[in-house]
Amino acid sequence: MKKLTVLGVGSAGCRITAKLREMPGAGNLHLLGFDCDAEALKNSGLPEEDQILAGVKWRQGHGCGGRVNEGKTAAAAERENLSRILADAGLLVVIAGLGRGFGSGAMSVIQSVTSKLQLPTVFLLTTPFIFEGPSRSRTAEQTITADLLPLAGAVVTVPNDLLLCSLGPDVDHEEAFALADRVMAQSAMALALTLCSGNRLAADYDTLCALLGRRHAVCSIGHASVAADESEKERVLVEKLLDSPIMGGSSKLKQADAVFMILNGGEALSLGDARAVFENARKYISPECEVLIGAGADPSWGKEMQFVVLTVKFDRNGSETASTEESLPAAGRKGRKRRSSLDDEFQPDLFSSQTSDLGVMEGTPPVIIDGVNLDIPTFIRKNIPVGR
């Protein structure tokens, strides 16, 4: 099995990535943490040599206080460093919690770097709890739709609010975050091992990208494990899966447009085991649903079997994200080579093309003439590149 890299971004991403160190199969992973907050990196539990401190000359090890633009600028300062570190990676899994400064701000930078390296990348992201407020939800949504979907191959977003369906009303918020971290770590491990192992049932990166299709989707993830010698293990695995904290119950399977089922186990894992588990799970899945399966065996799993299911529900209000070429104005395409954020080393991270970024005009009454918001700088509204 080839090694792959897992990059935890921001405090949540680093915490989740650190939990992978204790799981079976961790020896096949290169685990890294990326943040501008030195204390958060230190507290993540990742070894110091696997910590990437962003924008240290500017931030001096301090966090960006939830400010996305500052997080983006700090991350952009590490472009060359990231390119060097990721140059030999075979596949990258990026883990982050969206909604705040560095986790959201760094996404466009990472996407730019990995695209230039032609590095297959899966973004595994969580969106904020409802009690974190609408501002963080808007930030997360903006990051997904503007920074990732137009260019990223595989974007998996899981709402933390799914936890609220399985936790009692008196649950402590720290407990909720800890549980979300643990389940996301288990899911990231299963996804990584399946995409990079010598699978007994094939499921690769290109297939996952085709499944997601750069469309806006809400995902849920279920996780379950049993001893390989347990009686009726196929039935028990599926029952445990449906009770998983961020699965959302059997209704998520029934309503899904696409489902990715992953079974991992020790060397004794057989095709018969995989068939029995998948057939039991399919009882809860709509016949019209597109299903992708993967099964892999690794000695590090011993006598344990792990079953992970990713459900995908596409946003019916949107459509497939237009290609970068199609999204540019005609004037921006005619007579010259197309420029995208991938062609710029630093500029896009300072001048975001998101129309809602009003800078100092945020919160003031807009000046709108003929349907055009004149508070937004002309070069942003018209996608005019600014010379470096």
Where are the regions a protein language model picked out?
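Tubulin/FtsZ superfamily GTPase core signature
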Residues: 1-388
